């Protein structure tokens, strides 16, 4: 399944969960629970267990009941149970990411991710954030990431928009021109 098709299917699910959380006044709590569950199900041993066809759905459900039901809200527990019953727990990270986007939109928050090859000073980060503020009246939440693989330059994610001014991107473009003649 293509990523765009997958997101088109999962977005209504994330929206429905968000709507329930909003109605209950539990937006942050349900996000935190879903996020923790998502991390839990990324564990290799847990993943193997839940995708093992020789283990019955009943046994998987009992494990969820025993371990997660006591620590999750009934809404999050019900959702995780449904995903487990339908062997769809692997989509939880995607749903959590979509939920976060919906929650950010609802709360008027713009997420900015700044990726550089080496650590940048606070003044540079502040200049980038001030530039973003010129285009958005929303609250800005940002993170900086060092990724030596980009070689140099900068990549800035503003919401779902990517501005890639990395050396790696320039090299990839040159390689593409030489390879395909575009």
Curated annotation (Swiss-Prot):
User: Record keywords: Nucleotide-binding included?
Assistant: no
Q: Which residues form the signal peptide?
A: none
Q: Which domain of life is it from?
A: Bacteria
List the GO molecular function terms: proton-transporting ATP synthase activity, rotational mechanism
Where in or outside the cell it occurs: the entry states: Cell inner membrane
Claim: Ion transport is one of the keywords in the record: yes
- Predominantly, its location class is membrane
- Per UniProt, what is the membrane topology? Peripheral membrane protein
Q: Which SUPFAM superfamilies match?
A: N-terminal domain of the delta subunit of the F1F0-ATP synthase (SSF47928), V-type ATPase subunit E-like (SSF160527)
> What is the recorded function of this protein according to its Swiss-Prot or TrEMBL entry?
F(1)F(0) ATP synthase produces ATP from ADP in the presence of a proton or sodium gradient. F-type ATPases consist of two structural domains, F(1) containing the extramembraneous catalytic core and F(0) containing the membrane proton channel, linked together by a central stalk and a peripheral stalk. During catalysis, ATP synthesis in the catalytic domain of F(1) is coupled via a rotary mechanism of the central stalk subunits to proton translocation. This protein is part of the stalk that links CF(0) to CF(1). It either transmits conformational changes from CF(0) to CF(1) or is implicated in proton conduction.
> Into which family does the record put it?
Belongs to the ATPase delta chain family.
Matching PANTHER family? ATP SYNTHASE DELTA CHAIN
* Protein name, UniProt field: ATP synthase subunit delta 1
């Amino acid at each position: 399944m293509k990523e765009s098709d997958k997101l088109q299917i999962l977005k209504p699910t994330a929206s429905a969960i968000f709507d329930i959380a909003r109605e209950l006044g539990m937006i942050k709590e349900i996000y935190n629970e879903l996020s923790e569950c998502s991390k839990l199900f990324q564990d290799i041993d847990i993943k193997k267990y839940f995708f093992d066809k020789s283990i019955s759905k009943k046994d998987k459900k009992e494990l969820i009941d025993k371990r997660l039901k006591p620590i999750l809200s009934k809404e999050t527990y019900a959702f995780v149970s449904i995903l487990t019953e339908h062997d769809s727990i692997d989509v939880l990270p995607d749903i959590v990411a979509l939920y976060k986007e919906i929650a950010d939109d609802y709360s008027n928050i713009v997420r900015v991710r700044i990726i550089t090859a080496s650590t940048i000073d606070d003044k540079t980060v502040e200049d980038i954030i001030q530039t973003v503020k010129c285009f958005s009246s929303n609250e800005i939440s940002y993170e900086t990431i060092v990724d030596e693989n980009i070689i140099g330059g900068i990549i800035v994610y503003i919401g779902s928009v990517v501005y890639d001014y990395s050396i790696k991107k320039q090299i990839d473009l040159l390689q593409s021109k030489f390879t395909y003649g575009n």
